């Protein structure tokens, strides 16, 4: 394992204390860098900054496809159906398989409470064809816990890839749940 902060580099670090000592030895590390390394060490190298960057990349990738036409069964990048769009974005940005269909994506990803929703999560709805079952999926762009509303990006059958709001009556009555990609 090789971690770098500034010009300090630690290789095969066994303990947090050794890591901090190595940073101090180089003389380049400030308190913020040491604190960040401490956080990285305790969280197996996964930092909040990395998660935010990952979500930002997913959102940027999704938005770059605004206006792309809808074609049932299409997996992109020139056209998408709803699950083809979400799976393409996650596979293209993070090389993560999230499932092929909206039902599979709903089944295999981590259930979370609506109140815990955040950007990058998958949001699910019924569709006219699916009855009470999951039939549509999008990617959450933002969530307002005060109003319990969110915006999301998805491949719409009539308008292609677009941004919608949970306050639209069509989606209000069809909301099923939210999942976090594992």
Where is each model-derived feature located?
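Generic helix-packing signal
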Residues: 66, 90-93, 124, 142, ...
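Catalytic cysteine-centered active-site loop
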Residues: 64, 68-119
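Mature, secreted membrane-active peptide modules
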Residues: 41-62, 68-71, 79-82
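...with weaker cross-activation on analogous glycine-rich loops/strands in unrelated enzymes
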Residues: 96-159, 168
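Thr-Gly-centered strand-to-loop micro-motif
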Residues: 72-73, 125, 165
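Aromatic- and glycine-rich peptidoglycan recognition patches
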Residues: 3-18, 22-32, 134-182
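N-terminal targeting signals for Sec/Tat export/insertion, comprising classic cleavable signal peptides
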Residues: 20-53
């Amino acid at each position: 394992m090789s971690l770098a902060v500034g010009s300090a580099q630690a290789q095969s670090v066994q303990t947090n204390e050794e890591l901090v000592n190595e940073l101090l030895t180089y003389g380049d590390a400030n308190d913020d860098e040491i604190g960040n390394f401490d956080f990285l060490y305790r969280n197996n190298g996964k930092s909040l900054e990395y998660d935010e960057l990952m979500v930002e990349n997913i959102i940027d990738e999704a938005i770059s496809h605004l206006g792309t036409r809808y074609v049932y069964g299409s997996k992109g990048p020139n056209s998408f159906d709803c699950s083809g769009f979400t799976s393409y974005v996650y596979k293209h940005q993070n090389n993560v398989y999230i499932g092929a269909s909206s039902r599979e994506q709903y089944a295999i990803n981590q259930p979370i409470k609506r109140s815990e929703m955040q950007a990058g999560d998958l949001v699910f709805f019924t569709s006219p064809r699916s009855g009470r079952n999951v039939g549509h999926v999008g990617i959450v762009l933002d969530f307002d816990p005060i109003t319990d509303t969110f915006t999301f990006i998805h491949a719409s059958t009539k308008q292609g890839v677009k941004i919608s709001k949970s306050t639209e009556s069509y989606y209000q009555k069809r909301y099923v749940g939210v999942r976090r990609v594992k």
